């Protein structure tokens, strides 16, 4: 047996081995294709031998001086020398097929055989039509039907490459879709897990990719954020960006001096940035500190409502990740998203837990997160064109890092509500329920709640308003109407005062006042 016959026999054995677990139709088609290639190779060899014999005969006659005046050599048809290529069987080059090539997944060899780039992206036989009427159009459907009859081991033949090049020239606007091939091409490869990789193999993700969801998600992202990770942008928009009910200044009792400062330094610059430029550039970092429950978060929402700005509420969990380096990227994405939706307000509640004092024993990832936040916070304050305000709220200003304290230019103290402020809070809350309190009793309640924070007064009023419901039995509560409920009385509030106590001590207030004397803004 010659070497060529041994080679063809080895190919036949490899095909039988790879298709033994496939259906009978696929197995029969593979054997039939192999036989056709063998016949084409034998016919080509026969033609080559005949041509060589004619050349030898002509050379001998020339040497003997025998010529034929009317002899005209006719070039055989190209199909004699170049039979239609069927994948990896190119008889003219005598290329051998190795077992590793049969084991490699067909879709992974994208750089060598780019015809498989978009096998699943287009139905069979649908190619973009050419708009150039001056050139000859190629019937894509006919090409699809011809290609579907080929065996197609995932390779691109010279004829296929020529047709693809012509389609690309005629369809400049659809070059991304031209690489698609008909799905009808037969693929005899047996799918394996962890097949042998070759030099030309590309990485294939083990997770199936959904192109439709990715494109729809990326289309909702503004063009200014196209350079960022779409997943991080969605995370910031989903976790931090909130739509809340607008809060007016009248909803905040007291703090008249602080309101004037907010209006001058924050609200008007955000609404009229053309007036506040150069030296008049407003501060972009504001720190609200004071006892808990004094309305620091409510003030931030009111500022966002008055300035007609987007409100981003940040907590430490929104900027942390188990992957190294992702926390810094989330901080960068946060400021980029806020700049894209300007005017915007980034509110960081309990900022001391995120930007506390740095130490040598601190975790490296936490330290990098703080440094990245400080860099962007300083950048937001130095760029006059970006209307992004960063508001931090804390009840432990002593724990803040010195660099953070410097970047929060305006440090405003939010104290406990005064007697007039507590009176307004009580009047606003009891107005929602049926009561029989007069102005004198409301003033008395405001004096009895000295040292209470705004949250404490709110809790007191809610507890007192539940007294009429507590006086009812379960059976009465089932049948009673809303207008039949008893009114809230002064005795109900006195009972609530015995249950609800203040949550802020006088020592805590002295510490806040001392820190305000050193670092705070004096109204």
From Swiss-Prot:
Matches recorded under PROSITE patterns: AAA
Residues making up the signal peptide according to the UniProt record: none
Biased composition (Low complexity): 141-151
Record key words, sorted: ATP-binding, Hydrolase, Magnesium, Metal-binding, Nucleotide-binding
GO biological process, one term: regulation of microtubule depolymerization
Catalytic reaction list: ATP + H2O = ADP + phosphate + H(+)
Gene Ontology CC terms: centrosome; chromosome
Gene Ontology molecular functions: ATP binding; ATP hydrolysis activity; hydrolase activity; magnesium ion binding; microtubule severing ATPase activity
Record flagged with keyword Magnesium: yes
Binding residues annotated for ATP, in chain numbering: 253, 293-298
Region (Disordered) location: 114-154
A Pfam family of this chain: AAA
Names of the cofactor(s): Mg(2+)
EC number(s) given by UniProt: 3.6.4.-
Quaternary state and interactors: Hexamer.
PANTHER family: AAA DOMAIN-CONTAINING (PTHR23074), FIDGETIN-LIKE PROTEIN 1 (PTHR23074:SF17)
Family indicated by similarity: Belongs to the AAA ATPase family.
Protein name, as recorded: Fidgetin-like protein 1
Organism for this UniProt entry: Drosophila melanogaster
Taxonomy of the source species: Eukaryota, Metazoa, Ecdysozoa, Arthropoda, Hexapoda
